[in-house]
Amino acid sequence: MADLKVGSTTGGSVIWHQGNFPLNPAGDDVLYKSFKIYSEYNKPQAADNDFVSKANGGTYASKVTFNAGIQVPYAPNIMSPCGIYGGNGDGATFDKANIDIVSWYGVGFKSSFGSTGRTVVINTRNGDINTKGVVSAAGQVRSGAAAPIAANDLTRKDYVDGAINTVTANANSRVLRSGDTMTGNLTAPNFFSQNPASQPSHVPRFDQIVIKDSVQDFGYY
């Protein structure tokens, strides 16, 4: 095969000449007809090919899938980056989840509406969750701790029930000051009554009885 060179002819006619040569210089660029030819010197830009630039960023107008996750480095330890990664299975337990949000220490939540401070913070090392707002739940809020420790700790139902049962047992073993009915014997060193007996079922006071073997003005009993 012959090389195509300047002045090459076919059938006695020049193949390329000034009138039909498709390459044209345009400043530092070379155009093929009206299209720019990219080279090592003139590399394509992100805007030329609808790319997102590594250096300048950009916007994806549609869904993007990252099979290996998204990694976000942070200042204190660049070797232990944070990020969002695919989980190890279909589940919602400590052993299995669909995605993992990974942080060296904490995950913070901020509002983009005029607020610079975090309103929710999650400690990924021990699972502590702190919030400046209200915690609302449509279902039950459950705790694995058996008993409260701090003054502001919430209490479990079994702990409250146990305390109520203790109070009830104590109440059932005592006589109320406002009045009560004994189901057993009542023993005391002395009973003091402010009012004299006035009903057949009342216990009489000392000043309402005649003492055995005592001498009375009206005779001997």
Curated annotation (Swiss-Prot):
Q: Which GO terms describe its cellular component?
A: virus tail, fiber
Q: Where in the cell is it found?
A: Virion
Note the superkingdom of the native organism.
Viruses
UniProt lists the family membership as follows: Belongs to the tevenvirinae tail fiber protein p36 family.
What are the record keywords, sorted?
Host-virus interaction, Late protein, Viral attachment to host adhesion receptor, Viral attachment to host cell, Viral tail fiber protein, Viral tail protein, Virion, Virus entry into host cell
The record describes its quaternary structure and partners as: The long-tail fibers are trimeric, with a stoichiometry of gp34/gp37/gp36/gp35 of 3:3:3:1.
Return the protein name: Long-tail fiber protein gp36
An example of a Gene Ontology BP annotation on this entry?
adhesion receptor-mediated virion attachment to host cell
Instruction: Tell me what organism the protein belongs to.
Output: Enterobacteria phage T4
Function field: Structural component of the distal-half of the long-tail fiber. The long-tail fiber of T4 is about 1600 Angstroms long with a kink in the middle that divides the fiber into proximal and distal halves. The thin tip of the distal half-fiber interacts with the bacterial lipopolysaccharide receptor and specifies the host range of the phage.
